[in-house]
């Protein structure tokens, strides 16, 4: 089961990580001063990621 985990870092900021069903962390967030802000970011990702495009910047030329 994939899941978001919210936690507090050593500085007291709230962060989240997205974990795969095998327990591997797929990505983690920046720090947020308020827990509500971290929750809002998670909800935004859930709402907006399904239709997101993948842009490969390694193939672009200047």
From Swiss-Prot:
Organism domain of life: Bacteria
Source species taxonomy: Bacteria, Pseudomonadati, Pseudomonadota, Alphaproteobacteria, Hyphomicrobiales
Protein name from the UniProt record: UPF0339 protein Atu0232
Pfam family, one: DUF1508
Family to which this protein belongs: Belongs to the UPF0339 family.
Matching InterPro entries: DUF1508, UPF0339_domain, YegP-like_sf
């Amino acid at each position: 089961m994939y899941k978001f985990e919210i936690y507090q870092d050593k500085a007291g900021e709230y962060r989240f990580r997205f974990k795969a069903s095998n327990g591997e962390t797929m990505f983690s967030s920046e720090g947020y001063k308020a827990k509500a802000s971290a929750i809002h970011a998670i909800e935004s990702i859930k709402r907006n990621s399904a239709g997101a495009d993948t842009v490969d910047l390694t193939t672009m030329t200047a």
